[in-house]
Amino acid sequence: MSLGYGGTLIKHLEDDTSIIYSYSSYNLNDEKYRNADRIFDGTITVNKSCFVEPEIHEKLRKMPSGRKKLVVKRIPQGVDISEMMKSGKLVIENSNNMWDCLNGIDRIALHLCYILFNDYQKNGSYPDMCSYHV
């Protein structure tokens, strides 16, 4: 069963140093914040230096056929979003559909940032879109 809130993030602009994403958030439990038109009015600007490379583990494994195979695992690293915001490398402009905030920042935007950094570490490329639905 769903709690009825979430958000979506879409990449708009990318240059050599930064990426600008726009996001929308919604809360189906409150008529004022439903955002039925899915208007992307919040922005998240991320400096590319914020994207941390994952820790890579390589291991030789013996396969059932008897051959050995190199297995590569990408282990995501923790990202300090609050430190990035303090240094100005991560800038969040809240959506008009913000109903819950943490220190003046939309909670959905923070969840989307976490998913954004995690997707980068898993795939190795800057995500074009990500979403968070609870």
Briefly describe each language-model feature range.
Residues 30-63:
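A short, surface-exposed beta-strand/turn
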Residues 10, 26-28, 45, 122-125, ...:
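Short linear sequence elements within intrinsically disordered, low-complexity coil regions
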Residues 1-29, 37:
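Short N-terminal edge-element motif at the start of the domain
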Residues 10-12, 24, 45-49, 73, ...:
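A structural detector for beta-sheet-dominated domains
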Residues 50-134:
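Acidic, low-complexity intrinsically disordered segments
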